[in-house]
Swiss-Prot record:
Its EC number is 4.1.1.19. GO terms for biological process: arginine catabolic process. Its cofactor is pyruvate. GO terms for molecular function: arginine decarboxylase activity. The gene is pdaD. Pfam families: PvlArgDC. It comes from Pyrococcus furiosus (strain ATCC 43587 / DSM 3638 / JCM 8422 / Vc1). This is Pyruvoyl-dependent arginine decarboxylase. The record marks 43-44 as: Cleavage (non-hydrolytic). Disulfide bonds: none annotated. InterPro entries: Pyr-dep_his/arg-deCO2ase (IPR016104), Pyr-dep_his/arg-deCO2ase_sand (IPR016105), Pyruvoyl-dep_arg_deCO2ase (IPR002724). NCBIfam families: pyruvoyl-dependent arginine decarboxylase (TIGR00286).
């Protein structure tokens, strides 16, 4: 198997309920449009000159391996609010960037603030110039079924 550096990426987030916590996670992936692929978990570096998409490419093959940075949380505790957030920091000149993720028992605004701080610190410790921060998040309050919140950056080789 050979890997190539991704050329395109998209930020996604969703929350969903399900019959089990795993089904809730799967349902959130389906809501995002990535429930029928295999997510290959990555760490946090964005390749230089990546193109950011506004919508998923059409006809992604079932079972395709897609490099992905993601965070998720599931709960079956009625009344609890859970959130997942993912933030990207883009450098001057699109020479690369960083992705940070957070999920927890909190409102999405708290999760968003956490990833914003992480992006800023990641750039600071590297001595990189931060041009822009983008954040996606999802929040759900558990009712009578298990729930999940998921946030992801999915990368594509084409």
């Amino acid at each position: 198997m050979s890997w190539i550096t991704p050329k395109k990426a998209i930020m996604l987030a969703a929350a969903a309920e399900g019959g089990t916590k795993l089904n809730a996670f799967d349902n959130a992936l389906l809501k995002m449009g990535i429930g029928n692929v295999n997510l290959v978990k990555l760490s946090s570096v964005i390749p230089a000159h990546i193109e950011w998409l506004d919508e998923l490419p059409k006809n992604i093959p079932i079972g395709m391996l897609l490099p992905t940075v993601y965070t998720h949380i599931e709960s079956d505790e009625p009344g609890s609010t859970i959130s997942a957030a993912l933030g990207i920091g883009l450098s001057e000149g699109n020479e690369g960037g960083l992705i940070y993720e957070y999920s927890g028992y909190c409102k999405k605004e708290e999760a968003e603030e956490m990833v914003k701080k992480m992006v800023e610190e990641g750039f600071r410790v590297r001595g990189w110039k931060l041009k822009e921060i983008k954040i996606v998040s999802a929040e759900i309050t558990v009712k009578d079924k298990p729930a999940a919140a998921v946030a992801a950056v999915v990368m594509f080789p084409y």
